[in-house]
Every structure is written in structure tokens, then in C-alpha cells.
């Protein structure tokens, strides 16, 4: 039996000890003496969040298929354990072997959202790995970051040896081989990193120098070592049907956020919503073959025993063989008494029919994400959802017995006016109206329940809105009050509930999202002052962050509310995600002109991703130049 | 057909709580391809019930759950199929077919036997066979326990069926009421021994293993404790 890193008295004292003991069904144990590479895969948040992430499951499976590699998992210790580990000087450990992270060859950290940056420092700190990459020697694992936030790695550049830009399936094998070769040759760590920096998609920040203009924008960004590229092109899998997928995902003991089999049906999105980073980063859209998905579904259900399966993609309705796949799942899942959950489905007669078959209509609610209240603003953000489509979907659903609707909007979008904001209330009211028009009195089960939620818009790199000024906290809150007042004025206001997010964290996210290397210092200082779990409202300490930026002499409005020039060099411009800056610029202009751009299935808009020669880009369509 | 399944729980499984063990078994049964019965209705779930929740940190050689199956081959087949799906620390020990009129596992529980060992460095020097015999020989044992509503004081003696110390092994054996009406935590009994001997009690010192869970095969007046699987029979 394995020896646990934590003693019984600690495990009996902390909340949910199952977070730290490993031993889950399908977790992989290997003999450490028979592998060459120990890889610790980290999601820098609590176990239940980290275990729900599909990307890690894919990479965990991929690494453990390599005979020479043992990949283990590590998550952020919750604050209760965090303080015990500090007090008793217990090093952070991996779940499978329970051995210290510092003894590993690699520490891979997936960076899914900006608000986890201090948790990355917590992981390094508890592992006793120096914060700064340049202070590390061969006693430390190679710290490598990936995931969506690696597309602007600059605010955390000092803390990583390498960033992997793009999809993990392609370059890890060459990187591991290079590592083995370098170890054999007795290379220095620096020599290894120089050679790694020459692999496609890999960015080694310490070999790049940034200079700034007087106005604080970037003057130049150049490699300091010869032979390494000035531009890093993202890696991607051209045929995603042909790549590895976990047939035996780890099944946690405790209930996690994603407590089901997850089937990734496609990567990328054809839609091109202008606020959406994923929609640009993961282009072009590539589908997995439906027949192999059917096989995966059965195998994964058999190997895990899960009671539910979910389809994962940015916009499932756009998957070309959705109907066939879903009908197959309904049939086989019914036999197995398995539920199907279908997020990101457009509400139409097909999806309603499916939902009626797989869900309890009385309990479930409909979800629409119009994102903006008026058609004008929906054109600005290129969200191709019209009021007509929403009302049609809602009417169909009401006739089918549904009486709960969730609506998601954003506040603070570029060009937004009070008129657009009132549109949120008016649309909510019209949906309520549609219910009372559709469902006769005697068939009504109480009032229709409409929940409208707004989040605050944060401009992200590699979107057409990367040039847009973000709102201030005061503007955000004013917009939320305007929404609230407008809803109160509606005829059916009693049927509409309004929720809005807290504004401080959105401002913070905005600073980090479009930040540069100069933010490394305040992030480290904020961590040293005790900031961790910033993504968790109860732990987020806005006052500490504000104070820290001031101490570091950083004017945060430079990163948030500033109007960026069209010719400005952005901190992330050295990354080539496929979509060109010229395309994003033309989309930014289209947004300001309230002009809609067609989706990738209707026509090619020459975004630049076609050069990868895969997915939708290889399907003949009209090209709009 | 109702089955009573006995299993053990050791090692790191001590840190998996009762509800998570239930969830674990629901999935294991699916993986093992056992033809379990489901409730009818819109969200069907497995017909499954557990005898007595085991506290966090405790090990066990005598856990039970009842499940209903639509078909079955044999006890060994069932045990092997389910054991093939177990993680380290949890083993299926027996599976017995219950008579149709059997009370469910939880309602059947009358008592449980525990072995209490002591963690290194926390061994109580005062404990001897004689001390424990003297404790158990009392006509009443007044204890105070914390409940949701506050504290209650009661006589534990009627709920404490056996209590003995093994000098050689340095372990205590306890048989206590484990029914839903009169459940006694083993640590409460051990604390009473410490208290009587004016020794400072620390919960953490105890390494507790539930050895067996019993039903009452006798009468109310003349009880006869038998393992919970007693009323079932091997099949196939």
C-alpha cells in the first residue's frame, strides 16, 4: 500500500481529505524505477475543479501511454491544508506516488483563467521551486505552462521555463525526447531550454527581451539568443479523430464539477463572436468522426460507470452529424440508464425534442445566450442570434411544458448604450409575454420564471475587441443598475429575476488578460501578501491587489480603460494563433460599423487559419476577401 | 432478488465518506456489468441501501450493503466481477441471497464489534485487562455525548454489550449497539474508560476497526447476535 504524504491527523482535520489521497479508479500507477520521465500535471485550482477539466484528462492519458513516462496529477491545496503545509514544512506532492513535485522532471500547469495566477505561485512555493525561472537549476522540474492563458503568457512570463502555445497532442513527444537526449549528454538547463525554444509552438520567455516606449507601450520584442524564432506559431492537431482520447478517464471519489463522461465532439467554432477568445484561438473548427465518438461513448461509460454523458464543444449545434450521434446516445444510454446532458445547444425543435427525451421537463430550464440586449449590439458582437429566433425557440418550449428560462448577457460591450441595456429587460419581458400568449391559463403551472444574468465584459487578446477600452468599475455598476431599473419597469417584472456579477474581479481579470511582463512583480507581491484562490469570491482580496499595484507604480488603467492604437504592438503579438492581426482589425472595424460577418460554414472570411490546411478550411465555400 | 454484500474498507479508503462510498459502488456495479434493478420514474437509480455508515478515519472488515438484482449467476461470480472493479483498500468478501421478506440492511443492524488499537506514541499505560473488566463491571455507565441539540447525559451500559482488553495485543474489543435507535460510537465508550481512570483522552490516539456488523437472530428479551449476512444464503 502507498504511503500518504499527509499524516492521518492532517487528513482527519482538513475539509474533503479525498482531494489529496489519489487512488481513484483509472488513476495510473507505474514503477518509478522503470520510467525515464516523471511528469506532474497541474490544474492550479481545487481538486473538484481541476478534475473536471478535459484537457488534463487527454494529456494524462497521452503521457501515460508512453512507456518511458509516468504522468501524475497535482491540484491546489485548499487554504485549510495550505496553512498546515506551510506550518509543518510539508512539500507539495503528486496524487499518485505522493512524492514531492520538486523531484519530478516536468511540472506542467494548465492555465485556464487569469484569476488563477497566484495559485500558480502557491504551487511553486509549496513545491519549493524558486518563483523565477532564471533562479532554477537541474534540481527543479522544467515548469511548462499551457492552455488559453498561454496565448498571453507575459504577465506570468518570469515564472515559467517554457510555455506551450496550442494543443498539447503534437509537441510533447519531441520535447520529452529532447529532454532525455539533453540529460544523457549532460547539457546545462539553459542549453536544454535553448534547444526547446527551437521546437514548434514552444516559447521560452527568458530568451526574449522587451523594450518600451515612453508612453509605456511596447517598442520591440526580440529573441536574445540566435536561432530561436521571433514569432511562435500555435500547435494544433490537424485530424482530431486520429488523435488519442482517454478511454479510461480517472473517476474521482468525491463529487466534482464535471461528474460525467465528457465526449469532445469538435474543436473550434465557426461562429466568430467578436468577444470570444476561444472562437478565435481554436480555429479552424475540426470535427471528430461520429462513428469513433460512438465507440468512445460506450467504452468510456463501461470503463467509468458514470451515470451521465455530456457532449463538449463550443457550439454543439454546429456539429454536422449531431442528430445521428445524439439519437445513438439516446438509444444506448436508455438501455444503460445513463443521462445525457447537452450544453451549448441552440434551442430549436430538434434540441427540444432531444431534451424531452433525456431530461425531466419539469425540472430543467432553457438557456439562451443572446449576450446583448438589442439587435444593434448583437450585430456589433457578431452574435448571430436574433430576437425572432429566441422567441420562436421559447414559444416552442413553452408549448412543450417548459416554464423556466435562463438568459445570459454581457454588460460593458463596445459601443453599448442605455438603449441596448434596456433591450435586456425588454427581451426578458417579451419572453415572459410569449409564455402567457402560448400557454392557456388552465395549463399554467404558476408564473413563468425568467432569470436574466449579466457578466461584465473583459476584452481578451486575439479577439477583434482586443483594441477596446474596458469599462471602469463605476461604469459597470451603473450599467447593472440601469439593467435592474429597466427590468423593474417591465409589465412582467415579477416573472423576471435579475443577477449580476461582482465588478472588482472583472476589472482585475481585465488587467491580467491584456497585461505585459511588468505585471510579474505585482502578481508575485500580491501572492506574498497572501492572495490565493482569487477566482473564489470569498478569497479574492481586491484591496490587497489595489495596494500592490500602487506600490509597484503601476497605473492599471493602462491595461483596462485605455484606448489602444491600431498600430500598437501588443504583448502577445509574437504569438501567431492562425488568425491574423489584419483580420482581427477588419473585424474590429466591422464591429464599429455594426456589420455582421458570416460564419465559417457559410463563407470563408480569410481569417488566416486556412494555412493549417485542416477542418472547415478544407471544405469548398465562397471566399470573402 | 435481494443480495446482501459484505465488504472491507482499509487504507486510504478511510478518508472516503459514506456518501462517496455509495457513489463509488454505484459506478463499480455499472463497470462490473451487474444486472442491478433500477427504480422506475424519470430519473431511475439503483436499488441499493447501506447498513451502517462508517465514520471517517475508521477501517472495517464488516461493511454491508443490500442491492436488488434482476438476474445472477453465482456468489463467486458476483464477488469476482465486483472485486475486479475495486480500488486498493476495498474488497468484496461475500454476497448472499436474502429471503424475500428480509428487513433491509439498515433496519436489521443491532450491533457492531470494534477492535480499538492505539497509535504509536499514544498508547495508554493505564489500560489493563483488570481496568477494563472493572469498567465493564459497573452497573451503570453515565456518559455525556454531543448531539445536534447540545449535550445529553445517559446510561451507556444497556448499549454496551461487551468490552474486553487484550493485554498481549494491547487492543480493546467492544460490542456496542449500532441500531439506528441506540447507536454508540466506539470512541465514546473508550473515552468513558479514560475518564474513569482520570486519563486524558485524545480521539486521535484510537485506531478503530469495525470487525463485524450484527443483526439480532434471537428475541428482544434474549438477543442472539449474528453477522448481518446470517439470514442470507450462498447461491449458484
Language-model-derived ranges and their functions:
Chain B
Residues 2-8, 113-118:
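Active-site-flanking beta-strand signature of metal-NTP-handling nucleotidyl enzymes
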Residues 6-8, 12, 16, 20:
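Extended, well-folded interaction surfaces typified by the phenylalanyl-tRNA synthetase beta subunit core
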Residues 38-69:
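Short, charge-patterned binding micro-sites
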Residues 133-236:
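Core RNA-modification/binding signature centered on pseudouridine synthases
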Residues 77-86, 127-136, 189-190:
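Short amphipathic alpha-helices in soluble, non-transmembrane regions
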Residues 71-75, 121-123, 179:
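Helix N-cap motif at beta-to-alpha junctions
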Residues 61-115:
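Ordered, amphipathic secondary-structure segments that act as subunit-interaction surfaces
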